[in-house]
Regions:
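N-terminal leader/targeting and accessory segments in enzymes
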Residues: 1-88, 348, 376, 381-391
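Phosphate-binding loop of NTP-binding sites
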Residues: 5, 85-214, 218, 224-230, ...
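Residue-level signal for inorganic ion chemistry
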Residues: 35, 54, 89, 104, ...
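Active-site beta-alpha connecting loops in nucleotide-dependent enzymes
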Residues: 42-45, 311-312, 330-405, 454
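Acidic, Mg2+-coordinating active-site environments of NTP-dependent enzymes
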Residues: 64, 68-73, 179-326, 350-351, ...
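Short acidic-hydrophobic, aromatic-tinged amphipathic segments that line or gate anion-handling sites
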Residues: 77-81, 407-416
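ATP-dependent carboxylate/acyl-activation modules
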Residues: 104, 313-315, 437-443, 454
């Protein structure tokens, strides 16, 4: 973060002195002299309990929901909502800079699309990106606070659980272009219908300037029904839709990556290669290409830069341990992403394929159907065994069994490990995927300790 006067950073929240602010922090362990410390109340940890210590350690201002003992009143900024205060400060800071920025949202594929955007934009200049999936009221501001005078490009991921959240984030970030990857069933539990999810994702439009490009998936069933503001420039990307502005044709995908041609109605045809397996990642690459080229970046260089993509975290990360190929995809899960991950497993050359799949959360009334379909898709992908983990995954195991798959349903992590030890052997390919709170990442790390090293 570049130094900014407190009265400028905190404008709209309080009348502050023009002291120099060098950072905005929410973790008391990262407090440094000249920072603003923001207190977030939580179920397990309440930031207010650390406010006095933060002030003693050099914080210039404390943003809190109520007065805090040990912090002078003239150094306490009282706000009703810490998240909205973070957004306001980030918006004030964002006004100091003018990078070309892409905002990314959607039900599935946000983080992969963000990483493709980063690969493309980095080919043209210094680029800032959302780290991990820091895409909420804290993560988006923290990304924006990393802007500096020499930032030429940026890509910001925006997530949501409820209506109104994307609007708040996009008005704060004010991207130059937007991407909506697809509309699925993630967060159906909170929003009720896919149509409501569509409305929530379309909120990204409110932060885009007049004439801004908005890249949308032409193959998604709902996005073509969206009402797009006439002041924006929609650019449709896809594989199947013949009328898409940017299409992928001649797609060949395998364990080591995917090749295809980009057919662009505006700029021509380009060869593309990406180091990812699965046709779903082609959509993510197309989205990044479409948004970047409509910001005026050279199309041939954008297409070539897709090859520099690198996988992050436990998102379809393919590794080999003890002679076994693992697809680590433990961060999140929805029916759409399960189907995509199973297609990657199917494409691997290993003789035997095993799926370790856990519960998908926040699906609401679509939960049983989504888990049942996942079991059917596992069978269609030719898995030799399915280990289903969690109460919701019983339907998954039953559906796979009905299709002739050797499937078991586990209620505990120890049961899962027992079946993994029983089923998995060197030479196998194993897909590991579930919602993050199911803890499959930790379970997988435990199993790795049992495998031969080297």
């Amino acid at each position: 973060m570049q130094t900014i006067p407190a009265n400028q950073l905190l404008a709209g929240l309080t009348l502050a002195e023009p002291v120099a602010i060098r950072a905005v922090v929410t973790d008391s362990r990262k407090v440094e002299p000249g920072c603003v410390f923001v207190c977030f109340p939580g179920e397990r940890v309440d930031g207010h309990d650390y406010a006095a210590g933060a002030y003693r350690n050099g914080a210039e201002y404390i943003v809190a929901n109520h007065p805090v003992e040990g912090v002078p009143a003239d150094r306490t900024v009282i706000v009703p909502d810490s998240g909205k205060a973070m957004i306001r400060m980030a918006s004030n800071y964002r006004m100091l800079f003018n990078p070309r920025m892409i905002g990314v949202t959607g039900s599935v594929g946000k983080t992969t699309t963000k990483e493709f955007c980063y690969s493309v934009l980095s080919a043209f200049g210094k680029t800032l990106k959302t780290e991990g999936n820091q895409n909420n009221d804290i993560g988006v501001p923290n990304t924006l606070f990393r802007l500096t005078d020499d930032t030429e490009y940026a890509v910001v991921e925006m997530g949501m659980d409820h209506a109104g959240e994307i609007e708040r984030l996009t008005r704060c970030a004010r991207p130059s272009a937007g991407i909506i990857t697809m509309i699925g069933v993630s967060h159906l539990e909170n929003l009720g219908t896919r149509e409501n999810i569509l409305k929530a994702k379309m909120e990204i439009c409110t932060g885009l300037p007049d004439g801004a490009p908005l890249a949308l998936n032409a193959d998604n069933d709902l996005l073509p029904t969206a009402s797009i503001p006439s002041r924006l420039r929609p650019v449709w990307f896809g594989i199947d839709a013949a009328n898409a502005d940017v299409r992928a044709v001649d797609v060949v995908t395998g364990a080591n990556g995917t090749t295809f041609k980009i057919v662009d109605t505006q700029y021509g045809t380009f060869d593309a290669a990406i180091p990812t397996a699965g046709i779903h990642t082609v959509y993510d690459a197309l989205a990044a290409y479409a948004a970047a080229t409509r910001l005026g970046l050279d199309a041939a260089r954008c297409a070539a830069a897709l090859a520099t993509y690198r996988t992050t975290g436990m998102r379809q990360h393919i590794v080999e341990k003890g002679g076994i190929t693992f697809i680590e995809d433990c961060y999140n899960a929805s029916p759409d992403s399960m189907k995509a991950a199973l297609s990657v497993l199917k494409a691997l050359p290993n003789a035997r394929k095993i799926a370790l799949l856990g519960d998908m959360l926040e699906l609401g009334g679509a939960s049983e159907e989504g888990h049942r379909h996942t079991g059917e898709w596992a069978a269609d992908a030719g898995v030799d065994a399915l280990i289903a983990y969690g109460p919701r995954s019983a339907a998954m195991a039953e559906a796979a069994k009905a299709r002739g798959v050797a499937a078991v349903h586990c209620q505990t992590a120890e049961e899962v490990l027992q079946y993994v030890r029983q089923f998995v052997r060197p030479g196998d390919a194993v897909l590991v995927k579930a919602s993050h709170s199911m803890g499959l990442e930790q379970l997988l790390q435990e199993y790795y300790k049992e495998l031969p090293q080297g």
